[in-house]
């Protein structure tokens, strides 16, 4: 559907053998099973998104260089924001693995608090990251010439001249980079990734809810109550 690997799967009068039924009326375990899936799902989500985030940072650096604006203050600030975004997301993901929780059966799961923070940080920051890259690259992302223009013997010399970047960067070299940036940020694929950032592997609010639950489970409020009691001389 829409050129992406997505389907609508309909189960209509499907027979399921008894040996393939894993939860037969065990409703109390349903919530635990769902939440266990959530932590793994959030972990894999951030893991496979990090290369895309790194690519955005690389695109911004190259686009700024090719456009001759790498030394401009506000461009450097945007690039620093992209580094901050990528490395904070990575640090939270790695920390969720370091804080992993071992179950009695030997199964290991990511730390619920940290892995949801990682996913939330990624999702909340993705659109701003794309915006930074688009701003650095320029509006030519969507107005640049197509293949037929470059293949024209009449037009090609003009394109090479007027679309060139800083000294040493030809028009063709610059446009190859900008076409890649367009594919990541301004195409059907780019829009698809922006929607995924919001909804895939859990919505923004779902992640925040899990962070809140994990905070309560970690006993943050109970610790404060104990400290407040000690300060007031109450045990």
Please report, for each region that a protein language model flagged, where it lies by residue.
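Glycine-rich beta->alpha junctions and the first turn(s) of the following alpha-helix
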Residues: 1-86
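Short acidic (Asp/Glu) and glycine-rich catalytic loops that position anionic groups and cofactors
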Residues: 34-41, 98-108
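A structural signal for long alpha-helical coiled-coils and helix-turn connectors
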Residues: 61-68, 97, 101, 137
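Loop-to-helix element that buttresses phosphate recognition and phosphoryl-transfer chemistry
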Residues: 80-102, 121-124, 128, 134
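Alpha-helix capping/hinge segments and adjacent helical runs
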Residues: 113-235
């Amino acid at each position: 559907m829409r050129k992406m690997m997505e389907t609508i799967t309909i189960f209509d009068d499907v027979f399921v053998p008894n040996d393939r039924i894993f939860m037969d009326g065990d409703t109390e375990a349903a919530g635990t099973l769902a939440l266990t899936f959530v932590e793994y799902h959030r972990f894999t989500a951030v893991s496979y998104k990090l290369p895309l985030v790194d690519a955005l940072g690389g695109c911004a650096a190259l686009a700024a260089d090719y456009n001759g604006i790498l030394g401009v203050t506000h461009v450097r600030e945007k690039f620093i924001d992209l580094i901050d975004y990528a490395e904070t997301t990575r640090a939270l993901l790695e920390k969720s693995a370091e804080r992993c929780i071992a179950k009695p059966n030997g199964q290991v799961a990511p730390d619920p608090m940290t892995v949801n923070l990682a996913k939330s940080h990624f999702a909340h920051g993705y659109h701003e990251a794309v915006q930074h890259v688009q701003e650095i690259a320029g509006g030519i992302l969507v107005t640049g010439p197509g293949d037929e223009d470059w293949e024209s013997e009449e037009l090609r010399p003009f394109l090479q001249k007027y679309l060139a970047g800083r000294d040493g960067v030809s028009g063709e070299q610059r446009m190859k980079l900008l076409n890649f940036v367009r594919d990541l940020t301004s195409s059907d694929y780019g829009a698809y990734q922006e929607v995924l950032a919001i909804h895939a592997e859990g919505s923004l609010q779902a992640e925040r809810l899990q962070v809140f639950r994990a905070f309560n489970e970690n006993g943050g409020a109970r610790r404060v109550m104990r400290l407040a009691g000690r300060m007031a001389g109450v045990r």
